[in-house]
């Protein structure tokens, strides 16, 4: 079992070599992705992201601000990695087939909670899920969710 390190990624520099570093829907929440990548770049030669990305220039500012997100175009993400000599070696899009079942799953589970259990964060999650369901076609035009593998 691996030890857990409690740290802000912006302040963390690993002292171990890793086969792979994995970001699951978290890269978009980094304040400074360049700093984080610089911190971890000497500890791995492979980084995998499952990440939201912009597909259009219609930036959903109010939505992403509620979640403290920075959603980049894939070419911007690639440039962050390119600065550290990482190349995109694999890309697979998921949102077209995963958005609707994911939203339905969240809504079904949120419906099981009573009003006392619905904290402000849970209320925001529910509001977001309903927004995504009602605006699915627009969301799918503007935002993607992909697995991106970067290697050097």
What are these regions (language model features)?
Residues 1-11:
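Conserved SAM-binding strand-loop segment of SAM-dependent methyltransferases
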Residues 9-16, 31:
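Short conserved loop adjoining the S-adenosyl-L-methionine
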Residues 22:
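A conserved beta-strand element that flanks and buttresses the S-adenosyl-L-methionine
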Residues 25-30:
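A short His-aromatic
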Residues 68-91:
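Short alpha-helix
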Residues 90-152:
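Conserved Class I S-adenosyl-L-methionine
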């Amino acid at each position: 079992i691996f030890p857990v390190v409690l740290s802000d990624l912006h302040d963390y520099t690993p002292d171990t070599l890793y086969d792979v570093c994995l970001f699951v829907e978290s890269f978009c929440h980094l304040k400074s992705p360049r700093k984080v990548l610089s911190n971890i770049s000497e500890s791995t030669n492979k980084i995998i992201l499952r990440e939201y990305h912009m597909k259009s220039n219609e930036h959903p500012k109010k939505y992403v601000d509620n979640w403290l997100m920075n959603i980049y175009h894939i070419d911007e993400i690639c440039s962050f990695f390119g600065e550290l000599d990482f190349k995109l070696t694999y890309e697979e899009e998921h949102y077209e087939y995963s958005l609707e079942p994911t939203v339905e799953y969240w809504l079904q589970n949120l419906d099981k909670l009573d009003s006392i259990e619905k904290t402000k964060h849970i209320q925001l999650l529910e509001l977001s899920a309903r927004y995504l369901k009602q605006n699915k076609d627009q969301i799918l035009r503007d935002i993607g969710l992909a697995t991106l593998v970067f290697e050097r």
